Swiss-Prot record:
Primary localization class, coarse: cytoplasm
Record organism: Mus musculus (Mouse)
Biased segments, Low complexity type: 141-156, 250-261, 508-526, 689-698
One Pfam family matching this protein: DUF4592
Free-text tissue specificity from the UniProt record: Predominantly expressed in testis (at protein level).
InterPro entries (alphabetical): CRACD-like, DUF4592
Feature: compositional bias, Acidic residues: 550-572
Location of region: Disordered: 44-121, 141-293, 341-404, 438-759, 865-896, 935-975, 1017-1057, 1090-1137, 1182-1238, 1539-1558
This protein's name: Acrosomal protein KIAA1210
Biased composition (Basic and acidic residues): 229-249, 355-374
Compartments where found: Cytoplasmic vesicle, Secretory vesicle, Acrosome
PANTHER family named in the record: ACROSOMAL PROTEIN KIAA1210 (PTHR47743:SF2), KIAA1210 / KIAA1211 FAMILY MEMBER (PTHR47743)
Amino acid sequence: MEGFEASGEEGKKKSKFKAFKNFFSKKKKKEPEEIPEVAVLKPRFSSSSVSGSSLQPALEKQVMESKPKSGMGVKSISHDSVFCLDPEPEKGAGKLHSSPAPHRSKSLKIKSQRSQRLSISPLIRSEKVCEELEKFFASDRTTTTFRRRSSQCSSTPRMSSELSLDPETSESSTQQFSGFSTPATSQGCLDSSAAKSKIALNPRKQKKRKSTSTPVKVKQEEQLQSVPAKEKTTTKTKEAEQGEQKVDSTELSSQEQSSKTETQDTAVDKTPSTDPALRLNPRRRRRRAKNEWEILERGLLKSTQRYSLNTKAESSANKEIAGKEHSFLKLLLEKKDIGQPTTTEAEVTTVQKMPSDKGDVERELADIDVEAQKEPAPQPTSTDVAESMISGPSPHCEDKKKKDKVGVLPWIKKSTSQKEVTVLRKEEVQVHVHPSRVCGEGEEASCPELQRVQPQMKVSLESTTYHKEKHPRSGLPVPSTSISSATAEDDVSPKMNLPLPLRRRPNTGETSSDSKSTSEYESSSEMQLSPAHSFKPTRKPKDDAGAGTADDEEDGDDEKEEKDNDDDDEENVFLKSENVDVEVSKMEKQQALRYSSKLLGKPKAREASAKLESSSEDERSCEEMTSAHSSQSLEEFEECSESRGFIRGSISEERPATRCHSQALQELEEKEVSTESSSYIEKYESSEDLSSSEQEQQVPPVSKSSLKQWSAPAKPVHPIQTAQQQPPAMVNISGGPKKSGEPLSPTQTVKSRLRSQSECQVLAEPEGVVAADWDILMQPPPRPRLEQEVSAGPELTVFEKSIAVQPSGYPPQPSVKPSIKKEISLGAESAPLESPPPQHHFQPLLKPFVKQQVSAFERVISMDPKLPTQFQPRMKPQGKQSFSSTPESTAFEGSTSVDHMTLTLSQPMLQPYQEVPLESETVAAKMISTGQLHSKYSAHPLSSHQSQPVPESTSAEGEELLPSQPSVTPKFQPLMTQGSIPSAWAIPIYSPAPRMDSKPLMGSAIALESKPSRYSLQPWQSTPFEQVSVTPDHDPAAAAASWSPPIDPPTSRIPSQPLMRLAVKQPTCTELASVSVSQSSSLERLSSRFPFQPRADPEHYGAEEGVATLRRSRRHHSQSPVRSEFKEEVSSGSRRAFGERSISVGKMPPKYALQPWLCPEFQQQAKEGDVLRKAWLSGHPSQTISKHKVEKTPLPPKCPSPFLTRSKVQEISSRLESVIAQESSKKPQRGRPPSKSFVNFMAQQVFSESAPSKVVLHPKPVARGRRRPSRSLLKPKLDDYAFLYNWDNEPKEDTTLQNLPMKQPFQLSRKPEEPQEVLPFSEGAPVKWNTSARGISQALGKLSVSVSLPNEWKSSEGQLPSTQPSQAFDVAKLQSPVLPVDSANVPVKWRISEGHQPPQSFFVDYQPQVSVDSASAAAKGASCWPMLKDSASTTNVKYSQGYKDFTKSTPTSVIKPATFTSAPAQKPMVSMGTYFKDEVPKCCDETGTSSLLPTSKADVENVFGVRLRSTSQKIGMKNPDPCKPFVLISAAARKEQANKGDLQGSVGGSKQSRPAFSFEKKQGNWPRYEGTLKKSEVFRPPVAFYDQKMLHPRTRERLTRRSLSLPPTLPQREEPEWFSVAKKKAQAWSQIANIMQ
């Protein structure tokens, strides 16, 4: 019972405690109701003793009334004050402090007194300042001085919350302070010390505000009933105080925060009255608020601008802190500007309320007076201000300001805190112009006058930033634009931005982030565009921001008034208004052209800020055209309210045009992700030379010139819009937009001229360039319209229509912004793109950057519309305009192509999308599968470098209509930007032949070298791309370079050369292969005449390339020029891609056989020259794939396109080997006439015998030389990697290959050599590509490629005629030094092109830098060395030399050639296998590359039978080391090859056994080669690579069976007795070599 009683007592205590708690909570609730000010003041008072002291007299009474009810309540309050900082001030006021509280208060008395002392002088100053404020309201100077003083006193405190609040609170509480007791002060200090970090921080203080705001609203309603007038005035003061409080919160001032909290409670109590009224009557409330705000704003705007130096730091600090609070402007204006706009009214009320709280009765009375004054003033002010704003800064605005000042004077006087008033005004200004002030105030530090100009600039900048936050997608571009144009548009931009800065303006700011340029631009567009289009966006944004409803926009005056009244509401309604603006802008996006240009211009404007002055000059000239609006904007910008009114007025006047612009900009910005926009803009900026950049740059400055010119040309609303849209983003890239402007056929020359000018000028002055460019751009009105339509989804459709309606002369609308691109990607573009298919085939000048970031979107776009792709580039033009930066330039260039080619060039537009490796791949596949475009519409992206990347995608899209060969190279693209693009377009436009898949120009070079219209898209010389080939990004450049040869011989068949280039080359080797496999099959569907040669994207490139090859299978063997770099990075992927192309080539006659080159670039170029010549003869542009230098001399079209591929065997070795194994198993290829290349010659020697026997040897590319010995050397390494078994399997392969016609001997030499420079001599490299050539090409791909490709190869084997040689090149990644050699060796493959026979031997000399282990890896990923026995093998010498150099350069590289199966029906593979084995041991024996090289030469010189033996014998004499089998290969290796079984038997001693094994094959093959030297028998490096086996078990089994059957088969066929003896000797030699080692 006792326990129970105890527990009961405890329970009673607890219940009592709970009861107390509830009681106190109820009390507290009642207290706020009865005394909301006190409740509010509690937290704030605790945080700031000064503010608490100011309110303490009344608070004490109120607290005594509410708190005496219970001592416990007082105690709890005191405890709460310790934590909440609220009760302690009340205790100080009510003198009801708990024992600990007084101690603390006493302990803090000194601090509070000190702070008070410190604040006394500011207080005195504030009093003086109050007097000055009265004078200041009469004169701005006085106000400026006063605000400077107050801000000087408060700016630093504002920057630091306590300091700023202490002076203010001390100033405001000086009167209060005298009435306060020290405990209250100590409490304030205590609160400030304890709650500074807490309350000063936004969380708690904000929470207090929020918590108090909701209950205070109810309380306010009650209080409003009791004291409506006071509540109204208090609401205003509350708003001001809230703004100040926000600043304080950002400043982390606990004391003032507490006072503000109290003030907020009182103010909030009153605010709800206004808020509910505002909510009930949003327009009325907004108008009232706006009117009041206009009054305060106007006075504050000037004053703030003048003392912006002080407010600078404050605004920045406020931005940082308040911005965090504010969610809307999170990106850049997350700072004070973010928070203030939403809480502007509350802040103003709070700020005003703080003075009212400080001087309770007096302030309330003053507030009432202020309210009375404000209410009449704002109403006339709003109307008058609107009018004055329209007409410019007028005395009426001055009157309004004076009214505001008068209304604020008593308010400020009684508050005695000039800082608060200043802060209030500042916050008001910041709320309206906070973006500008955030940046503007920072910039205004220099001088008060500059403060006006700079704040204006910064208003635009900040509004842009604010808009950024509002539209993060477009935020990034917008800031740049507003920065650049803001400086120029300091006066104009602030105008527009000040009214909109609250929220709506940021959108408009972004739309017209360069307010000046926007205003000018809009005025110009107003002249040219319908007035509704020109300035509507500005007005509409405001209407949307201010009223947040379309109804507000209906009445211009009402809108102005509402905006003035809504300025307060804009803060609360800002998000909604922004949404409304977004919606409206979306509605107006249909006219997005003008908007998109603005949008684009804005991103660029920031970067072009340095160029801002020039832009401002242009804008000033534009202002001259729209001087009334510009001057009004400038003048009104000085006055926030006036500027706002002016903006509204100008909007009402220019609303038709500008409204759509800004809205379109807003919508586009919304669509454009800030990240995307930023990256997109960065791309633009990176490619300033590109036309889209130029256009974008042109847009803002062009507004004046464009007004003049555009009005002259026909006042093209759209061109103006386009210029407007583009210029801000394109300021840096003004050169780009100019280029982009070129695409219009009629204006193409002008655009080209613009590009040339803008490219040169963009860097210097985008403004002047833009002006000149816009003059030109204004001439093609259709394009602007297209841009307008393209800018948004609806606009995109309009754009599409415009293009369709307009002749191809205006096809390219580079005006299309990145946002448009994005929208295109969204799918809006796709619909419009489809509508105008033939009219505008402007090859999108895809910019490298645009390719990367915009490519995803663009690809989607390109995928969707086939014919509309023309418009896509236009839609993308802005992105392409700066060829590298965006597809806008592509659009322009593409536009030109479209104009000339009409429909033919529409597809290149898609290429920018395909530029993205992954997405582009999918896009390419989709486009290919669609195949809507006719082959005649060869998508040859002549327009620009960017356009070239796009052309690939476009080609993929173009598919049948235009097997566009987008040779896109980032580096090359800049070349196309200026004059070259026009010529390219003109040529491609006219030249595009239905068959001739436009070889996507890798840049303007193609255009410059433009050949007959059918070759319009022919890529220029790839030389620049060769340089680009260093990077995977530059693979397209290589492709373009290779394309250039097709340009020289304009053959319709050569149109599409998928340039497997940088993008494909390095970045997505692995993915590329897989994609290429699937796409290759899809391409097969397409007719060969539509060979689509996807450009550089590694993934899509391979896939598209394969597809293009398939398309071209019959008519064109697409020779995807693969750069050495591409070889390196895309080695596997490239190979696969090439394999796919080979497959498509397989469909094509052997003349179309592809030849991947792996030799040094110079050799590749030399060979490529032959190949190109052959390719041109054969009429297959794919041969242009050969090196850039080779491009100069296109080969006959018959020649299979050689794939210049270099790869690092180390990375790709395993994959290559598996690919080779698959290829060998999949594709037996017949040998064609031995290729001229050294490797081809050796392959011919080796394959000549195997070709008659239809034996596919798996030659191991040996660094030893390009001739057969290297293959034997390769064999040993392959033996190390189960090459013994592979060689056993190889006979089977040979047999299988025998089944294939000898025409298609695919000689894929693998270098199983260990990490030695011997590898560079992949004599097995000469492989002939036939139907299985595709498989071989795939073999070129990485292991994954080999895995996926072999299946396709197999299928392609059956599909492709044996006559078509597929030349695969070892894509294995070679050492960087090896790569050039590979390029040299690769040309060997071109020899096939001589006879245009499928067995175009590719001497893919790849020297994988691999050690013995590397050799194993190489064996796994052994790079394929396709070698064809074409009569064209004359190139072998060059390659052999280059190959030797390559070998030397890569001493450690071990090349593991992927096994290529050339099915020489004549020769059994057994001898070849033996030969390889012999060579491989030699390679193993010969660590020195030099010995291998001579051996390879000797082997090449001699038929594989005898000479190779000699070489191997010599090698054996020199180097018994199996790692040096090259020397041993000639004789000893042959002997060891005779001991093929031994080699097979011993994997550990595979080097020795390899030599024997290889020699067996060599010896067996040598007689055959002697008999049929020119019949290149494909040396299939045994697919015994473990990786290959694992990757392709079927291939391994197949190879194993073949190897088992081939040795007997080959000897049975053509193996002479001496060959068998030689095999035995080779085996013995390999063993001897091992022993010697």
